[in-house]
């Protein structure tokens, strides 16, 4: 199981995280030191995370999760390491490499490669969801599947 923990206030409504057993849940409410979450089949009784005893844990981005959201490899580029392009959305390019999804903002093709004004790397699903929201893609972030 992943040893990383998240502070409750670092989450946003709609973010995916899991409990200490790896059970995935989606955040429904966030406070300073607590967060409530729900999961498929839940009958309205929210799960409570807190920063002391029941800390939320991140869900690592995997190839399977990307495929579940219809993000498929569209090509690759050789930078320092191999990066597989999994999605283009307007001025954004999403590259997958070694367990990390990088979002290239305002990317351009240059000398048979890519350059970008800003590059944000995400290892966890909740990080990706928050970057998508900041980039104006809230619908995609809130409908992300695990």
Located regions from the model:
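Intrinsically disordered, low-complexity, charged/polar segments
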Residues: 44-72, 117-135
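Mixed-charge, Lys/Arg-rich low-complexity intrinsically disordered regions
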Residues: 1-11
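Amphipathic, interaction-prone secondary-structure segments
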Residues: 72-99
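Intrinsically disordered, low-complexity regulatory segments enriched in Ser/Thr/Pro
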Residues: 93-121
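Short beta-strand-centered aromatic/proline hotspots
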Residues: 16, 22-33
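Charged phosphate-binding loop/patch that engages nucleotide di/tri-phosphates or the phosphate backbone
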Residues: 132, 136-146
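SH3/SH3-like beta-barrel fold
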Residues: 35-41
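Hydrophobic residues embedded in beta-strands of well-ordered beta-sheets
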Residues: 34-35, 78, 101-103
């Amino acid at each position: 199981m992943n040893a990383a923990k998240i502070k409750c206030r670092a989450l946003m409504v709609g973010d995916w995280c899991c409990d200490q057993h790896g059970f995935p849940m989606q955040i429904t409410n966030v406070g300073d030191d607590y967060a409530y979450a729900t999961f498929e089949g839940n009958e309205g009784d929210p799960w409570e995370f807190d920063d002391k005893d029941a800390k939320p844990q991140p869900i690592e981005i995997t190839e399977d999760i990307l495929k579940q959201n219809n993000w498929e490899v569209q090509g690759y580029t050789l930078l320092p390491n191999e990066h597989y392009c999994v999605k283009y959305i307007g001025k954004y390019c999403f590259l997958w490499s070694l367990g990390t999804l990088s979002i290239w903002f305002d990317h351009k093709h240059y000398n048979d490669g890519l350059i970008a004004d800003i590059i944000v790397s995400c290892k966890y699903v909740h990080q990706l969801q928050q970057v998508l929201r900041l980039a104006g893609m809230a619908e995609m972030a809130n409908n992300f599947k695990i």
